[in-house]
C-alpha cells in the first residue's frame, strides 16, 4: 500500500519495546508528528536490539511527505483518531497464524515475547476499540 501511494512509513516498531508496548507515544508525537504537522522534517532515533536488548539507535530522517503511514499496534489509538485521514485495520483472524508470521519475521528466539505481545494486543484493542473505529478492514494473503 505504501508503495502504491508513494507514502512514507514510520513503524511503531521503531519506538516500542517488549516491556514498553505503548507509552512511548509522546516521543512519536514530539519527534515525528508535531514537526511534520508544522511543515518541518522530522528526526527520531529508532529502537535497535543489539544483543537482544533495546536501545536508541540510528537517527531516522523523515522529510515532509505527501502521505504518512504510521504502521503498527496502537497506530490508530483513540487519542490520535481525530487527526487521522484514515485508519486501516489489518485482520489476521487466527492467533496461531499471526504468531507464525511474527516468528517468521522476528525469529524463533522471539516466540515467548511475541506470545506476551499478542496477549497485550488483545487487551489493548478491547479497551481502545481500535477495530471499531477503522475506516477499512483488510485481510492480507
Placement of each model-derived feature along the sequence:
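Small-molecule kinase domains that catalyze NTP-dependent phosphoryl transfer to phosphate-bearing small molecules
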Residues: 77, 107-141
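Receiver (REC) domain switch/active-site residues of two-component response regulators
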Residues: 13, 85, 135
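Conserved AAA+ ATPase "sensor/coupling" helix adjacent to the nucleotide-binding pocket
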Residues: 31, 35, 101-108
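Glycine-rich phosphate-binding P-loop
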Residues: 1-4
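Conserved nucleotide-sensing/catalytic segment adjacent to the nucleotide-binding pocket
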Residues: 8-70
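ATP-dependent NMP and nucleoside kinases share a basic, alpha-helical "lid"
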Residues: 54, 58-105
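Active-site donor-binding loop signature of nucleotide-sugar glycosyltransferases
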Residues: 14, 92, 140-141
Amino acid at each position: 500500500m505504501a508503495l502504491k501511494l508513494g507514502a512514507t512509513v514510520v513503524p511503531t516498531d521503531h519506538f516500542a519495546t517488549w516491556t514498553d508496548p505503548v507509552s512511548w507515544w509522546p516521543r512519536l508525537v514530539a519527534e515525528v508528528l508535531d514537526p511534520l504537522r508544522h511543515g518541518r522534517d522530522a528526526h527520531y532515533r529508532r529502537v535497535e536490539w543489539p544483543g537482544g536488548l533495546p536501545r536508541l539507535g540510528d537517527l531516522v530522517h523523515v522529510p515532509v511527505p505527501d502521505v504518512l503511514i504510521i504502521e503498527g499496534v496502537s497506530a490508530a489509538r483513540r487519542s490520535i483518531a481525530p487527526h487521522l485521514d484514515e485508519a486501516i485495520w489489518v485482520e489476521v483472524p487466527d492467533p496461531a497464524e499471526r504468531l507464525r508470521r511474527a516468528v517468521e519475521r522476528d525469529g524463533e528466539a522471539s516466540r515467548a515475547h511475541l506470545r506476551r505481545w499478542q496477549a497485550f494486543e488483545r487487551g489493548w484493542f478491547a479497551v481502545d476499540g481500535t477495530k471499531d473505529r477503522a475506516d477499512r478492514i483488510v485481510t492480507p494473503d
